[in-house]
Amino acid sequence: MSKERLAYIDYWTHQHTKSGNFLREILSEEFEIVDFWWKPNEKIPMEEIDKFEHMFFFHTIFPYQVMKKFQNKKILWAPMYDALNFRNSFFQSIFWKQISALGIKVIKFSDKITKSIKNEDIETLKLNYFIKPNFLALANEENKMNIFFWDRGRIQIKDWLHLFNKKDINEIVYFPNPDPGVTMMENNDPQQQKDYNIKYINKKFLPKNEYLDIFEKCNIFIAPRKKEGIGLTIVEAISRGMFIVGYDDATMNEYISDKRVGFIYDENTIEKINFSNVIQNYEYRKKNAELNYNKWVLEKKKIIPLLKKKNKLIKKPIFLLLFI
């Protein structure tokens, strides 16, 4: 028996990052997936997409006037918190009223999206993504701090280095590789490199096997952005039992549940990271990762039934829907 076809509409950069592939794997159990890679200012292939009864939008979604043409479809959207930028609370409210009017169903990978939607009548599914744990990290068997920092141009070494006592650090593995379109500030302080034993990775691209090899040698992961839609590198680090240091915003402050798992900071943080929290709680982090992964395995089963439900169209006063 052949599978139903599903239009999977994704942001074009994810062709390379493959950040939406974990959802493709889930959806492919039920559907034959046809990818549409959307890029801003390029023509939307309306006629092709309109042939599908089921549509899944990851990260991106088309403007309201376009989405209105798909009202009789079964649509599920997984927005990313770090990509939702509203001019003010008024436009935020109007946006979610439009999503509600279209009956689009929403997966929420962040509590911040729940707060953004507020009380709008939108059918949602709250999920926390975790991957299968793999506890082989050699560094976690040692009584020293080995730090990995992938500098993506969003956070600098100076933003978090003061959180550590210098005597506790064995080495810092530093990979300067910015996000597309982001200009990095050079970190070329020779004395700092010597004092903190900073080891540079001078590559433009790090294959996944090399990336995971570094994880094996480090027990602390510095979250590279101030906010995330999901934070796939964070999820990978959690699966290795690493101690996560993250800025106080989504999704870091959701994944870091207590000080045995990681450390949350902002510009006003003066507290230092406790050496014993890193070294003595590896077993706790392992159990925490296993527990949360098992929850994910159960919860992800709700995705396909939600997608297959017919969109619930809600009539709204027309003046609310004239924006965008």
Question: Which positions does each model-derived feature cover?
Answer:
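Short hydrophobic beta-strand element within catalytic cores of glycosyltransferases
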Residues: 243-246
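Membrane-proximal helix-turn-helix segments that form the acceptor-binding/catalytic region
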Residues: 82-83, 88-106
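A charged, aromatic-enriched C-terminal amphipathic alpha-helix characteristic of glycosyltransferases
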Residues: 267-319
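N-terminal pre-catalytic "stem/leader" segment of glycosyltransferase-like enzymes
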Residues: 1-61, 249, 264
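Aromatic "clamp/platform" in nucleotide-sugar-dependent glycosyltransferases that forms part
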Residues: 226
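Conserved catalytic-core segment of nucleotide-activated headgroup transferases in glycan assembly
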Residues: 133-134, 141-194, 198
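Short alpha-helical segment that forms part of, or immediately flanks, the ligand-binding pocket
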Residues: 212, 235-239, 253-254
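Active-site proximal beta-strand in glycosyltransferases
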Residues: 54-56, 69-86, 107
